[in-house]
Amino acid sequence: MEREPRARVALVPERCGRGPSSRHRRPGLLLPGLWLLLLAGPASCAPDDLSLAQHSHPVRPSDFLPERSILHSAAQVTLSETVPRSQPSISALVLSSPSATAFDTAFLSQRQQTQSTAEPSFFEANYGSVTSNEVALDDEEMDNFLPDAHWTSSRGVSPMRYITPSPPEPPQEMLEPGTTPSLPTISLPDEVLSGCQNTVQQATVYVEPSTYFGTSWSAFLTSEGIIPTPSRNSVLHPIEIHSQLSSKALPETVASVTEGAENLLFSSRISVSQPSGNGMTQQPSVPLWEVSQPLVGVLATSSDRYPNETTAWIEHPEEAIALRAHPGITTSPTDPTFSSQPSALFSTPLSSVSFATQLPGVSEDSFLSSEARGALESWHSSPVPSFTDHPYVLSPESSLRPHTGCVSCVVSSFQQELARSLTEKDMGSGDRLETLSTASVEASHVSPLSSVGTDLSELEEPQEFNTLFPSRPVFSFSSRPVGLWKASMDVSPEVDVSGIAITQVYPSHGRLSTPSSLDSTFGFSVTSDLVMSSSMIHLLSSVIPSTHFDSSFSLTANQNSPSFPAGKPSLLTSPSLVPSAQSSAFSHGAPTSSLELQSGSRLDFTSGFYSTPPLDFSTPAPSRSDELAFPSLMSSDPSTFFSQTFSTMAETFSLSNSMNLQSPQLSVLNPTSLEPSQPQSSADLLLNTVTVLPSPPERPPLSSSPSDSLEFTEVSRVSLRESHVHLTSAFSETTSAFEFSPIPHESTISTLVPSSSEPSLGIYAAGTHLTSLPTTVFHLTPILTESSPFSTLTPSDGSVRVTDHHTPVLPTPSSVIPSSTESISDPYLSASSSLVSEVSPSPPPTKPVMGSSLTSTDFPPSTSPELSTSLELSMPSASTAPGDTVDSALNSEPMSQNPQGNSVPPPQPSLGPATTSTLEATVGTPALATAKPPYVCDITVPDVYLITTVLARRAVQEYIITSIKEVLRIHFNRAVELKVYELFTDFTFLVTSGPFVYTAISVINVLINSKLVRGQTPLILSVKPSFLVPDPRFQVQTVLQFVPPSVDTGFCNFTQSIEKGLVTALFEVRKHQGTYNLTVQIVNVTIASSRVAPRRGPVNIIFAVKGSQGFLNGSEVSDLLRNLTVVEFSFYLGYPVLQIAEPFQYPQLNLSQLLKSSWVRTVLLGVVEKQLHNEVFPAEMERKLAQLLSEVPTRRRVWRRATVAAGNSVVQVVNVSRLEGDDNPVQLIYFVENQDGERLSAVKSSDLINKVDLQRAAIILGYRIQGVIAQPVDRVKRPSPESQSNNLWVVVGVVIPVLVVTVIVVILYWKLCRTDKLDFQPDTVANIQQRQKLQIPSVKGFDFAKQHLGQHNKDDILIIHEPAPLPGPVKDHTTPSENGDVPSPKSKLPSKNIRLRGRVSPSDADSTVSEESSERDAGEKAPAAAPENKALRAPQSGAPLPSSGNEQHSSASIFEHVDRVSRTSEASRRVPSKIQLIAMQPIPAPPAQHPVLADRVAETNKINKEIQSALRHKSEIEHHRNKIRLRAKRRGHYEFPVVDDLSSGDTKERHRVYRRAQMQIDKILDPAASVPSVFIEPRKSSRMKRSPKPRRKHQVNGCPADAEKDRLITTDSDGTYKRPPGVHNSAYIGCPSDPDLPADVQTPSSTELGRYPGLPFSASQYIPPQPSIEEARQTMHSLLDDAFALVAPSSQPTNAMGAGTGVPASLPVNSTPSREERRATQWGSFYSPAQTANNPCSRYEDYGMTPPSGPLPSRPSFGPGLLPSSELVPPEPPQPQSSTDAPYAARGIYSEEMPSVARPRPVGGTTGSQIQHLTQVGIASRIGAQPVEIPAGRGSQYGGPGWPVYGEEEAGRREATHMLGHQEYSSSPLFQVPRTSGREPSAPPGNLAHRGLQGPGLGYPTSSTEDLQPGHSSASLIKAIREELLRLSQKQGSVQNFHS
């Protein structure tokens, strides 16, 4: 039967033209259903439809409807009597509204199928209508009122019909008929209004008949207009109520139901009932039905009360829908199916309403009334019979069972729907479907309940009803429906408390009140009722308050009436139920508009209903505020509930969630309010639970006997009714109404208490008792007490609510709550341990207070816990404000409720209640808001502000009060008032000043320093705050720098702002640590400065932080907060912070003197007294010392930082003491523990700390440190470390310098001595001779090397300086620059090393050895021979010597053809040596001359020696030269290059050079013939000439042409020794200095030589043999292979040294640098443009680089920049050396500098070695005279196979290259030197690269090598060289002359 009616209901909604609504719900599941309902509403709302709806709606309105249908058995008559068509139409209406929404398509189809039963149909339809409305709102999301409007039409018609029938029917009869009207009513509001306008009109009429409700209805209708939200609601409930209640009650009831969802309806009905008040049992049922119709009136009344709400409904259709969908509406059409949720709620309420007298009818009719009144006791008592009756009539059990399933399901489905947003969108119909689906689950949960008893089913129905309520609440009736729904939730928890179904209840939902109901016949029903009573029951209670509110509803009823007057606030009552989430949502929604109004009106109204639950609802209302607060904390209160409170009752919780979701729908309208709303719902649920609690106790007796239940109900009813009447009559006077109500509660409660044998009952009884007590003690207090179980139920809430109905409930409860909370806690526990236990668990999840008041098993766990938790945190600090906002928002929506709503929220913040703290907090807030709390802080829970004093016996309280006021007035400088809470043993009071409340601590701080406490005869023995002060170890201290004078730190708002800031800061620092709930408790606030100061401070704030596990250690909080910077922390607190957070009590380690061995002492300077006396100083120093320890590892070993205990070290300050002395010294004594907790010894600790830099330590510590950072206390005389350090410094400062100096001296000595030895070794000549003999093949190398050496050196020099100038070459130069750049210095050193090495390893080769010896000889001879050239020559010699070493290697390389890189390097190095040797042979005579010229005896001696050796070997040398020359001539290279040089060089200079060279050669050949002076001059010229290399170097320096020539020669040399090419070629390319190289550019080379002849060294001595550069090119290809390899290297190295480093110096010696520069310039000018092009110099010029001020390197192009640079740079330095005429010194230097260059170049190839030999013999002097800038390397490069190419190709190429410049070189074969470079790489890369740059591609080395190949005899080579040198000397002579 149930299912059929449900199906019908579903059908009806379809027909009830709710299409739009259903579409809107579509978003939810409900839209289609609504649409169908709307469509089916008027016409198709047939009983079948209703049946179908009922049948299919086990989950949604139809569930509630079934009950209504059952109830309607009585009301049915009325319906039929009123209008048979009305029933069907009503059914259609109802179905369309709720069933369409709830059932959606499925339900609709079912409803269509099962429209058989009119009563069920009506109930179903009516309820469905409500659901549809809810759906519409949900769809609208509070935005869409079209559905409302559409539904309104339907509803209007249907509700009117129903209303009409309802009033006529007697309450009992009307149970069933009433059910039908109920359905129409519901449909009327949403769809029926438009669909069933007639009915609506009737309803309106009824409303008008209802004194108050009629007005409301009118208003509601007016405000709603087409929107039949009021009608719909009123229709639904009013019809039911109508059945129960008398016709006169019906109009009001209808209005109430319509407008306030069930709550409004009840309120109206209660009003009516109370007025009718007769036979509350029976009369109430009629009034209920009347209320159903009056519901319309009530709606109107509500509208009147809160036209805003009506407006709100209109504004927020969703809200309206929610209300309509709300169980209130849903309940009214309680079908067996609908009953599941709505029915159960309504059915129970109806039962309650019906009471014993009208059990069957009343049960059904009571369904509404029981919701309203049965919410509490009468609900419980009557529900059993009622349910029984109803089930019997409508097969209530069936409906109940399905209902139970539905209720759970509905709740579940609601949540699910919400989750799906189906429910949200179509709370009405979609919800139903959801409900159905969840019904099975819920049913499963419920089934145990059901098994418990038949009532369980019914209760389940109420649960289902609740689900509908949530849907309805979505609609404009959402508030009330929410209330109902919430009530259901509450009930279920209560049921759980009741006992049998506790577990089941939880599983099913908070609403599993069904289990409760099952448990006690009406227990379950009660639970349902309670749930409904939370919202719907409240409505019912308002209709039939006395019964329901008995214990909890008495107040509720009273409040209900006031609520109703308040307006929709009564609807808001619903929030007290789980719907409170929805209600809360609606409350929030109300802020949105409709929701708020509904919230305010309904909730308040509900509050009225709930007065006891009201307290509950009062909590709901406060909840609204609380919710606002809560929402801020937990926007998804329902979900929280679900998880926490309803974890067991997932489904029930789901419903709650659903409500919440609906709330969110409302939320959609007003998301802000929604969120708060959800939290509110939690609170509401708790409150509801409270409400339930009182009722269940009553009920349990009822369950034992239905009649008992009825009796209880009656008693309750009477009391409630009385109070309710009072309330109603004094709507505005909440207090009076409440007062009355509380008394009835007391009476009722008394009954309930005894009757409550079950734990639930016990709980309820406890709640009731509390209520009674508060009633007796304090009207508000009694209410609070009653509410105390629900915290919100505090009478204050009730009275306040009545008074500030809109803000209601919340404000009122706040004041009462504190008392009630305590009372409740105890009574609760005492009344029933089971209940207590339940309550206890709840508080933990929620608030401590709240939890205790609520049963943990009860819905409170589900609702309360989360909400509580949210409330707890949010409420205290922000609850009031948020709540206020929400409330105001809600109230805003309902105009009347707004103000109160605003008031209420502020109280919410208070967290006062401990047991019912959450609820209390919620209620407490309302209490504050009771009169729109005049205080800026919520004193609802005044614990924070209460001061408890123990008075002396002689103290007179009046006097004490006056004295305290006076003391405080004087201190605070403003008038204060004392609010005394207790006058006896403990004098408890709080202090206010205008709107401000002084914190307890601020008052205590004043009193304890006053005479009242400290006087000789104190009147006050002790003063303490009423709250518990945490242990000091939990306390944390924060110091504000100051507060503005306008800020009074004693005011509550200051501490609240600080608490809020601290919570925010804690959240910030812990946001990454997961979720957490922390509350801050301000323990003390003290301020230092006087009130007068412009800045009052510092302000010390001591607080404690409480988490879920209790208080957190102060050190832990301090560590957390100190992660913030002072600025950040100041930002959070809103005031500048001086000290972030320090533990109030610091942990102390073992400070025993026995552990003194671990104590460390540090003395700080500059610590002022203020800092020293700061209590934080030791802690700060501990932290800084720990940081200092963390620095130790970092300082010591960064990579081991992690392994050190740095951050893990623990420092404990033992003592801080002031010392005598200057600068405020302070001694810190402390010890250190490592990360393992092991104490470190003082020595170890101090050693660790002392590893940190003193300055760093001072920075970290923030103070200067005296002496050592740390020293053991036991050994204060710890100078040992100092003395050790001092000793160490002595060692470091003395020993190390001594060692360094010694090493330097040794090195210098070794270098100098070694150089001298090398240079002056007497066996040099012999060696040279031998070498030359051996070098015969290397004679080629000799000449070539000479040239190359000179040029090579030039190259090095060029390279050195050129690199920058020459971009392209620079790269190569860079590499060569290793030889070149470094050459100046590097070359020198390397050269020296190489030279030494060469000498050291004379075993290079036969030639190498001989070369070495010859080099030595040359080195010695050359200097001697050319004293003049000593300076230059010395460098040259020096260079050559080193070069000789290199040459040796080079020679070896040359001969062995070892890797060219090595050869190149060696060539460069060796070439100088060889050159020296070779040069020395010719030099021997010149040296003698040279010394004369040089004026240096040593030089002369050396020269003489060299000359002697040279003479001895002259023939051999000449022979070699001749061979070389001949070879070159044969090849045509020798002469040709010479020709070039001559042609290109300065003819005069070259001639001069040549002459000098010739003379030198002659002297060498004929030592006797050589005259020192002449020889020297010739030598100079000869060297210059003969070492065109030097000239070339200079030329290279001065002119790239020479460099090229050299390169050409080098190429030739490289022919044999290609290694040098890279370097040597480069060098040569710079400016050919080789006699042969000059072949191409020999003119330049000769010129250079001419230039250089002035140089101390007679570079041209060997030049004579050298043909012109052109010849050299031709002949030297062959000769230079040998000669250049030998000559060029040494001459070049020398030159390189001289040129690079030495040449300039050497030259300067003979010729000032200016001369060199002049030469360079001359070179530049000297060379003809063609030559310039050909000449490196010209190239140099081509590069755009002017020849270096010094003679441009022969290969300027290569390194014109390099060589020139080298020369330029070196020239001057070398000059001094030359000036010094320290050939050796210069040579040494050059040997160091140049040799590196020179050697590197020669090292490149064997040619280098050969050249070195030659160079040693002849070029050494030349090198001395002019370091061959074109090093042997260059020579070798030139001497390379490419030499011929250079000679021919290279000539042009070189020209081109010169023209092109270095870049061209790099691209040109010269730059191909890489192979040469490859050789030279062994040579310093600098040279190599340089050479490479100059002539990487030059084939000189090859060709020169070829030329120099051993094929030529020494004599022929020498002869050829001599000839070439002669030519070159001529050319160079002119050049030199020109330069000179």
Swiss-Prot record:
Predominantly, its location class is membrane
Query: Where does tissue-level expression of this protein occur?
Result: Expressed in retina photoreceptor cells (at protein level).
Composition-biased stretches (Polar residues): 788-797, 878-903, 1722-1737, 1901-1915
Where does the chain cross the membrane?
988-1008, 1288-1308
From the UniProt annotation, give the residues forming the signal peptide: none
One GO cellular component from the entry?
membrane
The reply on keyword Hydrolase is: no
> Where is the segment annotated Disordered?
788-917, 1362-1451, 1579-1599, 1695-1782, 1863-1915
Which InterPro entries does the record cross-reference, listed alphabetically?
KIAA1549
Positions of modified residues (Phosphothreonine): 1611
Q: Where is the composition biased (Low complexity)?
A: 808-840, 860-877, 1421-1435, 1759-1769
Q: Identify its membrane topology class.
A: Multi-pass membrane protein
What kind of modification does the protein receive after translation? Answer: O-glycosylated. O-mannosylated by POMT1 and POMT2 and elongated by POMGNT1.
Q: Which residues carry this modification: Phosphoserine?
A: 1377, 1384, 1543-1544, 1613
- Which controlled-vocabulary keywords does the entry list? Cell projection, Membrane, Phosphoprotein, Transmembrane, Transmembrane helix
Which compartments is it annotated to reside in?
Answer: Membrane; Cell projection, Cilium
Stretches of Basic residues bias are at: 1581-1595
Q: Which family does it belong to?
A: Belongs to the UPF0606 family.
Q: What is the purpose of this protein? A: May play a role in photoreceptor function.
What is the recorded name of this protein? Answer: UPF0606 protein KIAA1549
